[in-house]
Amino acid sequence: MDPLKICENYLTFRSIIKGSTFSPGVFRRWRFHALADVVGNIVEREEGRFWEIVPETHTLWALFRGGFTVAPFTEILTSLQLENRGRQLAFLAFLSFLLRNWPSDSVVSEDARLDLVCAPAWSRIQIWSQAARLINDLPESVFEGQGSVVEEECGEEHLARDSDDPFFD
């Protein structure tokens, strides 16, 4: 299952994120794409880690309460790395986590929240996918004689830990 391929269509992506916010059960499995169930299960399993990233006292929640979403999402999306399925699923789960825990006293209606989260995220996913396709289409001669930037920046010990698991230990 390639999450980015499945999320190429905005309405499908939106439906997956919406479905992942529902409680586990027959409704989520029957009504939404299978990826929504996978993402929802990741959110439930890793909710503690998400709360460590964005605790209840974090400024992000106050911004969401006031309806300010552009700056927080710009910050989140500019650092986004989607090079493997684990990171892709973790990102989708994080979006679902944000929607599930959006302050109930926010000035943003529940209907608008979904699009405020999905539109910039989907745009970033499309940019990432297009860039990856362009890089894959480059001839091999372009890369000859050049070491991998990732290897130089991260070192082999970090690369050995990279995985399709969204939260490898």
Swiss-Prot record:
It comes from the Viruses. InterPro entries: Adenovir_t-Ag_E1B_19kDa (IPR002924), Bcl2-like (IPR002475). Belongs to the adenoviridae E1B 19 kDa protein family. Coiled coil: none annotated. One of its GO terms (biological process) is symbiont-mediated suppression of host apoptosis. The lineage of its organism: Viruses, Varidnaviria, Bamfordvirae, Preplasmiviricota, Tectiliviricetes. This is E1B protein, small T-antigen. Keywords: Early protein, Host-virus interaction, Inhibition of host apoptosis by viral BCL2-like protein, Modulation of host cell apoptosis by virus. The keyword Transport does not apply.
